[in-house]
C-alpha cells in the first residue's frame, strides 16, 4: 500500500497491485490499456471508447455522473477520475470508495505528465517510461507555421479554447496565432464577431462525439453565422477532424499518435 497525493491535495492509499479498477476518464482508460491493465478494469464511463475493447466493460457513469449501485456491486479497489468538471462527483464517490483524481492537462507536456502519473499510481513505471519516450518521438513532427487559426468543437454547442487548454498549447506549438490564446480560460463559448474581426486563415472543426461532421455541413453552419467573407471560407481552408470520436478533445496517448501527425499533415496542405 502506497500513499499518493491527488490533484486536490487529498491523500489516497493505493494497493501496489490493483485488481479491480474503475476509470471514469477516457484518457486514463486508454493509458491503462497501454500498460497492459485492461483486464483489471471492471468499470468505465460511457465516453471511454479507446481502445475498442472498452465496449465490453461495464459502464458505470459518464463525466459527471456515476451509478453508485453499480460501484457497490463491482467493489473497485480504486476509482480513477479527472479534475475539472467531474470534481463534485469525485467528492461524492470518495465518501464510499478509494478514489484518485488526476489533474486535467493544460499543456501538451501536461498530457505526458498525466500518462506518466497513471504509470506511477499503478506501479507501471517501467512501461510509463517506455510510453513517454515513444510519445516524445511524436513531438518530432512539430514544426512552425505562420498563419492565423481557429479551432472549434461541438460539445453540445460551439466551444473554443483559451490559454489554460492543452488544445491551445498544441496549436501554438505549431506556430498558429489564435483569437483567444491570451484569454485566461480553459474553454469558452466563442464570440463570432471577435473571430470574424480576427479573420483566421484556417478553421479546424471537431463535430459532436458519435456524430462527427463534414466540410459541407461546417461551411454552411459558419456561413449562417456570418463568416461568409472570412479568409478560411474564401480559400476553402476548412478542416474537419477524422472519425466520430473525440479527437482534440481527448488527451490520452492517441493525442501524440493521431492528433499531432494529423495536425502537421493538415497544416502542410494549407494554401494561403
What spans do the regions from the language model cover?
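His/Asp/Glu-enriched short active-site or ligand-binding loop at hydrolase and phosphoryl-transfer sites
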Residues: 45, 166-187, 207, 240
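Short, conserved catalytic or adaptor-binding loops enriched in Gly and charged residues
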Residues: 50-53, 93, 225-237
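A short, structured surface patch at a secondary-structure boundary
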Residues: 2-5, 19-87, 179, 227
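Extracytoplasmic substrate-binding proteins
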Residues: 1-4, 10-14, 20, 78, ...
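A ligand-binding cleft/hinge motif common to bilobed small-molecule-binding domains
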Residues: 87-93, 207-221
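Short, charged, surface-exposed secondary-structure boundary motifs
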Residues: 50-57, 70, 109-114, 215, ...
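Proline-aspartate-enriched helix->loop->beta-strand connector
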Residues: 65-84, 98, 191-209
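A conserved mid-domain beta-alpha-beta active-site/ligand-binding segment of alpha/beta enzyme cores
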Residues: 162
Amino acid at each position: 500500500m502506497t500513499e499518493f497525493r491527488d490533484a486536490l491535495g487529498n491523500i489516497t492509499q493505493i494497493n501496489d497491485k490493483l485488481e479491480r479498477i474503475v476509470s471514469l476518464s477516457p484518457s486514463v482508460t486508454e493509458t491503462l490499456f497501454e500498460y497492459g491493465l485492461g483486464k483489471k478494469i471492471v468499470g468505465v464511463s460511457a465516453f471511454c471508447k479507446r481502445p475498442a475493447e472498452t465496449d465490453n466493460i461495464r459502464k458505470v457513469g459518464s463525466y459527471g455522473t456515476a451509478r453508485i449501485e453499480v460501484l457497490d456491486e463491482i467493489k473497485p479497489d480504486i476509482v480513477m477520475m479527472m479534475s475539472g468538471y467531474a470534481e463534485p462527483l469525485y467528492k461524492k464517490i470518495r465518501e464510499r470508495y478509494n478514489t484518485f483524481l488526476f489533474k486535467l492537462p493544460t499543456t501538451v507536456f501536461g498530457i505526458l505528465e498525466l500518462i506518466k502519473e497513471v504509470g506511477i499510481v499503478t506501479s507501471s513505471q517501467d512501461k510509463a517510461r517506455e510510453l513517454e519516450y515513444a510519445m516524445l518521438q511524436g513531438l518530432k513532427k512539430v514544426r512552425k507555421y505562420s498563419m492565423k487559426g481557429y479551432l472549434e468543437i461541438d460539445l453540445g454547442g460551439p466551444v473554443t479554447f483559451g490559454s489554460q487548454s492543452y488544445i491551445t498549447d498544441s496549436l501554438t506549438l505549431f506556430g498558429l496565432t489564435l483569437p483567444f490564446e491570451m484569454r485566461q480560460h480553459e474553454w469558452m463559448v466563442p464570440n463570432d464577431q471577435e473571430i470574424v474581426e480576427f479573420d483566421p486563415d484556417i478553421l479546424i472543426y471537431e463535430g459532436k462525439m458519435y456524430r462527427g461532421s463534414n466540410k459541407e455541413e461546417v461551411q454552411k453552419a459558419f456561413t449562417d453565422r456570418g463568416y461568409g467573407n472570412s479568409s478560411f471560407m474564401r480559400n476553402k481552408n476548412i478542416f474537419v477532424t477524422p472519425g466520430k470520436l473525440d479527437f482534440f478533445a481527448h488527451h490520452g496517448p492517441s493525442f501524440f499518435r493521431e492528433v499531432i501527425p494529423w495536425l502537421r499533415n493538415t497544416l502542410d496542405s494549407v494554401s494561403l
